[in-house]
Amino acid sequence: MYQVLKPSRSSTLPMRHLNYHVRHWGPDTSPLPTLVLLHGWMDVSASYQFTVDALQQERRIIAPDWRGFGLTSSAQADHYFFADYLADLDLLLDHYAPGEAIDLVGHSMGGNVAMMYAGVRPERVRKLVNLEGFGLPATRPAQ
């Protein structure tokens, strides 16, 4: 059985008519930028436990459960738009890392959200890692 090396803490942030669950690892402050981990579709923040345990540097790490996943409440809708995830991420960062340029990792759908967020809020993202996110279709400026 796997033995957790770096236990997480949980918090809940009420925002946008939801109760957002956020998992935290490491100290509340660190000289390194906050590392934000975004899970993919049908996944949860706890899936990053193995990754966090493998990191050598001690730093502040946060990972939300997206709306409708894990311990975050679900909106009364049968679908979500990327704009919902982008707005949620922006508010989460304003709360947990105000004004800070973060290191952002996203897997699958989380990778897509991370790429879009870095595109619309480049001042908030210091480094970006996209794990298995798919690219968006090419467009022409006229579109």
Set out the residue ranges of the language-model regions:
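Short aromatic-enriched loop/helix-cap "lid" or pocket-rim segments at secondary-structure transitions
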Residues: S73-Q76, T139-Q143
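A structural preference for long, well-packed, hydrophobic secondary-structure segments
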Residues: R9, N19-H24, L37, H107-V120
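Active-site loop/oxyanion-hole signature of alpha/beta-hydrolase fold enzymes
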Residues: R16-L18, R23, Q56, A63-V105
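N-terminal cap/lid segment of alpha/beta-hydrolase-fold proteins
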Residues: Y2-N19
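Conserved hydrolase catalytic core segment
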Residues: G99-P141
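A conserved amphipathic alpha-helix that caps or lines the catalytic cleft of carbohydrate-
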Residues: V52, L93, Y117-A118
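Conserved HGGG/HGGXW glycine-rich cap/lid loop of the alpha/beta-hydrolase fold
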Residues: H21-S74
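Short, conserved structural micro-motifs that define repeat-unit consensus positions
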Residues: H39-A46, W66-L71, H79-Y80, L104-M116
